[in-house]
Structures are given as C-alpha cells and as structure tokens.
C-alpha cells in the first residue's frame, strides 16, 4: 500500500469508527502517530544541514492551529478570508507566503466536505485534521525564515476573537463599499453622526427680506400695540424712521435699516444728451411763440375746417396768451382764472 494513501485511510477509519470501540481507536491513533513520526524523522534527516553559501531556495511550512475549540461561536474562517477573500490575499502579498485554510470546517458545504473526507484521496486528507492555517514559504534560507516569522506575527492578529477590532471594522467598510451601500451612495445616515439643517424658504421680495425673529417661548409677553393672530407669531413694533422691507409676508426687525439702493450711473455716461439734446434745445416754446406773435402775412390766418365754425370760437386763444410762456422744458403752470367758464371750441362734436 502506498504511503500517500495509507495515512488518509487511517484517519478516515478513525473518524468513522464508533466511539464504543475503544481499543480499535487506540490502535489506529498509535499507527497514525507512528507513521507521522517516521515522516518527521525523514524530514529532519534531510534538513540536518542548511546550505547558505549556495543561497538555494528552501521550502518552509508551518501549520497554525485555529482555536475553534476555545471559541466555537466565533467565525475565524470568515475573518481570515474577509470580503470575497481579499483579506487573505492581501496578507499573502504582504508577507510573501502562501496560506491555506485546511482541516475540519474549512469548506462551506458540510455534506460535500464529508463526502470528500470519506473518499480517501490524498489531497483531501487534511479534512481529517483540526482546523488550521498552512503557511508555506519558498525562498532563500534567510529570506524564507524572515517571511515565515512575519507571516506568523500577522496571522496571530486574525486569530483574536474580537468582533470590533480594527481588522473587523476595516472588513465591514470594505464590504459596504463592495455592495455599493456607502453612506454617500444610498443616503443612509448613521445615527448620531449627521447634523439636521432646517431648510429656509427664499424671500419673495425684491432685494431679499429680513428673516423673521425666532418664536418667543411660552409665557413671553408681546409688546404693546401689536396684533397677534391665533397660530401666528407676534410681530415686534417697527421703530419710527426705520424703512420696512418690501418683501411680502415678512416682518421688519426693529433697529434694522435696509441697505441703500445701488447708485445708478448718470445718464450722461451713456450718451443720451448727444443724440437728443441739440434738437430739443432749439425748438423751445419761444420758437413757437414767434410764429404766433409775428405773423408773416398781414391778413389774419386761421384754419377753416369746413364745419361752419366762425372766428369767434378761436378768439379765446389770442396770440397774447402764448407770449407769456416760459423758455424751459417744464410745463406751464395752470391758469388761476376762477371766474368764467370757457366753452371748448370742439364741444359740439
């Protein structure tokens, strides 16, 4: 019988044997120890001398026991693997060692694990051992032992049964990132970490209105002279001389002065006088007065509209009345004639 198949078969028989067969179990255990001891002696003979001059690569392997018996409720395999196995991958990259989780409970499917363990194949012989981590290093002697020591120190941190340590918190953050359920992605705020901000409604008035003061506490007296409606906040009295804001629906705060309106540029800067000033300066009311005061013909002129209107209707607009007009652009002041009422010449139409 081959040595590769002999040890797995012994372990499989020991596990499948009923506990009532005490002597058979003892004999199987002695045979397993004897076989493992012989393999260990051969390996010790081969490793008796270490050649560091040639600097050849050597293979180191250590099996680190996972304390599942001391802490049966803690998931050490999940902590070692991490989200999608990334924790174990990073640990291998950092240490430069190959790590494998072997033994009972290393597979997720327990029924399949039992089938493979009973199959007797050499590659599944580790399923009969205790749950452990196999660390393998293949490198020159000095570097190989350095990597092994580093790997042992790092693997020790993962075998601490703590749910809230730094490793576990980092794995939870990575898991939330991989699942796309970050706080900023879905908007799920953590209790106690967010600050609630009350929204402020924009002012409807031009230039912005002053926000109303905070509501007074219960029992606070309102100022005299203010009207308080049910369900509305009391409005403080407005100081005399203070301009009120132009926004609708907001009350003025006493003592607040609205900022002055922005000073507009003079019209002179935009060149309005250049285009129209010269034309209106020449054609003032004096220019029109000359046409009425000094007629060009000796015969009196009037406009005959052909409606049978006589000259008496135009006598009220004598030329001497137009001579008293002002020479500015301002409209003439209204006449203060209170006595007679003058009929309009076009009143009949």
UniProtKB/Swiss-Prot annotation:
InterPro entries: BBP-like, KH_1_KHDC4/BBP-like, KH_dom, KH_dom_type_1_sf, Qua1_dom, Sam68-YY. It is found in: Nucleus. Methylated. The keyword Protein transport does not apply. GO terms for biological process: mRNA processing; regulation of mRNA splicing, via spliceosome. Residues 340-349 have a biased composition (Basic and acidic residues). Signal peptide: none annotated. SUPFAM superfamilies: Eukaryotic type KH-domain (KH-domain type I). Gene3D superfamilies: K Homology domain, type 1. One of its GO terms (molecular function) is SH2 domain binding. Disulfide bonds: none annotated. CDD domains: KH-I_KHDRBS2 (cd22469). Keywords: Methylation, mRNA processing, Nucleus, Phosphoprotein, RNA-binding, SH3-binding, Transcription, Transcription regulation. This is KH domain-containing, RNA-binding, signal transduction-associated protein 2. It comes from Mus musculus.
